[in-house]
C-alpha cells in the first residue's frame, strides 16, 4: 500500500456518491475543495507515455505483484509499474467526479478546464488475450492466481466506469476475471482468505446480474469468514466485510449505478438467485433519490417507488423497461412482467 497513492481518490468517490443519493448541495459544496485538490494531484502524478496517453506511475496493484523480465532474468517477481489498472480507473473517476461536481454547482475553474482535457488522455485498462481485465498495462503473470485483492475490477464495483448496459465488453472481462480469482481461491492458491474480499466478489457478481454466483460467495463468507457473533473476520474483525455483505444483498435486489439517455436506471431484482423464489424488501434507497418497496414471487416483480426529489428514471427488469418522470412525493407502482 505504500506505493498506492490512489486511496484519497477512493475516499473522494464516496463524497460524490453520497450526493447522488441525497442531492445535498451544501455537502457537495464543502467537498469541492477536496475534490479539486485530488484532481490536481492526479494530474500532477500522471505522465505522458510518449504516445499522448497519461499513465500513473510508479504505482502498484495493492498488495500483489507480477512476474516480469528484467536484467537479472526472465521471470522476476516485481510490484511497481506504470499504468496499473487500479490507478488508471481511480484517476479517471477522480476527474469525472470533479467535473460532475462542478457541473452540479455551476462552478468554472482553470482546474476544471484542464481536467476535461486531461481525462480524454487517460486510457482505460486493457482486456488481455484471455479475455480478462489486465491488472497491469502489460500482460504480466500475476503473483497469486487467487489473490484476495481484485483492485483492477474497481471499474465495475464500487466504481461506475463499467456496467452491463453501456460497456458489455468490460462487464464480460470482469466476469472472466472474477471467475478466475474465485476458481483459484477455492483451490487454495494463496487466495481469497478474507471476508472483505469475498464480500467484494458478492457485489461484483450482483453488478453482473449473476445471482447464483453472488449467493455462492455469500455462503462461502458465512461458512468461513463470519464469527458466531456475526463479525466479519480477516482473521481479525474487519467491519468492511459486514458492510460489503449487506451491500451485496441490496445490490442483488436493486441497483442504481447506471445512467442511460439522461435517465437514472433503476434495475429491479437484477440478481436473484434461483433459490430466491419469493421475498420482499422495504425502504431501499437509490441514486436519484428514490425510496423503493420491492416484492417478488415466481418471476414476477412488483415495486412501489417514491421520489424525494424530481427526476427521470428508467425502471428495468430482465430487459423490459419503463421510463418515468417523477415529482417529489409522488409514488409510482410498477410490475414486471407488465
Say what each PLM segment does:
Residues 212-338:
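Non-catalytic C-terminal accessory modules of carbohydrate-active enzymes
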Residues 37-101:
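Acidic/histidine-rich catalytic neighborhood
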Residues 65-81, 182-192, 257-277:
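Intrinsically disordered, low-complexity coil segments
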Residues 59-60, 115-120, 269-276:
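A glycine-rich phosphate-binding loop feature that marks nucleotide/adenosyl-phosphate handling sites
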Residues 10, 55-57, 291-295:
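Structured core elements
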Residues 1-33, 84-261:
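Active-site core of glycosidic bond-cleaving carbohydrate-active enzymes
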Residues 2, 46-48, 82, 146-148, ...:
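A general structural signal for short secondary-structure junctions and capping/turn motifs
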